[in-house]
Amino acid sequence: MSGATKFIKCVTVGDGAVGKTCMLICYTSNKFPTDYIPTVFDNFSANVSVDGNIVNLGLWDTAGQEDYSRLRPLSYRGADIFVLAFSLISRASYENVLKKWMPELRRFAPNVPIVLVGTKLDLRDHRSYLADHPAASAITTAQGEELRKQIGAAAYIECSSKTQQNIKAVFDTAIKVVLQPPRRRGETTMARKKTRRSTGCSLKNLMCGSACVV
């Protein structure tokens, strides 16, 4: 990248209690908050290096509760990328991606790309937790990938704030999606229509194992 450092505004959205704030705190401080405090993350801005590119990454946290529905879209102005999160142990948060969040994002920011993120990966296969929480419903990787296709997200990543698995990958991926020129994104879409070979994907370098699907 040449010239001035590019500023990227990244806004996290999703149902309340899916772990958006925890994800941001873990990414910026490498610490996992032990107590749940709704949306206490201050807006964050710092220079980040990804694949040799230095960008100034701005992170915006939003509250998912209905009480904030009128105020929340104010954070969307100027967004370059959305990190749309749902919990891998909450069927309701998964379903709300289509029912609630996509209509809202497409109304207020129709052309902004999305990275879909499944949070609380460490609990999906945690048998004792699932046994103690009958209302919990595990979402599979295949279901997450299907949702990614439905909403047209640029990538799908599963992560855990508690173990910090793939936390950095979430935001590295968001940065890479923004840095990829729009023309190239269009070419990627056309390539996928013409061939099913994975080698035609210009986002191939975003792959980060089985928990990250592009």
Curated annotation (Swiss-Prot):
Post-translational modification comment from the UniProt entry: May be palmitoylated.
Highest taxon of source: Eukaryota
GO cellular component, one term: cytoplasmic vesicle
Residue window of motif Effector region: 36-44
Coiled-coil residue windows: none
Residues spanning the membrane: none
Membrane topology classification: Peripheral membrane protein
One Pfam family, short name: Ras
Location of this chain's protein in the cell: Cytoplasm; Membrane
Predominant location: cytoplasm
Keyword Lipoprotein set for record: yes
SMART domains associated with the record: RAB, RAN, RAS, RHO
GO biological process, one term: small GTPase-mediated signal transduction
Function: Inactive GDP-bound Rho GTPases reside in the cytosol, are found in a complex with Rho GDP-dissociation inhibitors (Rho GDIs), and are released from the GDI protein in order to translocate to membranes upon activation.
Protein name according to UniProt: Rac-like GTP-binding protein 2
Native source organism of the sequence: Oryza sativa subsp. japonica (Rice)
Gene this protein is translated from: RAC2
